[in-house]
Amino acid sequence: MPHFPQTQTKTRSPRVRVPNSESIRFNLGGRQVSAVLQKISLTGGLAEFTASIGSATIAEAKLNTISGQVNGLVEFLPSPDGTAYPFRFIALSDDDYERLSSTIKVMQQQGFGA
């Protein structure tokens, strides 16, 4: 059953800083674009692109983690500078959600909490 992360809760989802310039890939209307993942949480993240992605609002995201590949549907939020784009997950499978959750827990234990 798909998981739809809820962002309207009173408790903010824990964020972690992503070290080592980890890559995340987005499918923007058939165009594959890579970015550097800066922060990640169970509800979204922040990706740094080399150039503006234009008016794209919805994309498929693929991220390799220590727990396995995470695939999800994301919505981009307005960029403060034209290259760093916050995004929120709008759909994740149960397995992808569990892999992401496990990865974030390990990163928190390693001291990468944001």
Name the predicted role of every residue range.
Residues 29, 42, 52-54, 79-82:
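Short strand-connecting beta-turns/loops that link adjacent beta-strands
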Residues 40, 77-79, 92:
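Residue-level recognition of beta-strand microenvironments
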Residues 13, 48-54:
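Short, surface-exposed secondary-structure edge patches
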Residues 45-49, 81-91:
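Short, solvent-exposed secondary-structure boundary/capping segments
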Residues 35, 71-77:
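Short beta-strand-centered aromatic/proline hotspots
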Residues 58-67, 97-109:
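Extended Gly/Ser/Thr-rich low-complexity repeat segments
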Residues 1-42, 101, 105-114:
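N-terminal helix initiation/capping motif
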Residues 21-27, 56-69:
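Short conserved beta-strand and strand-loop elements enriched in small hydrophobics
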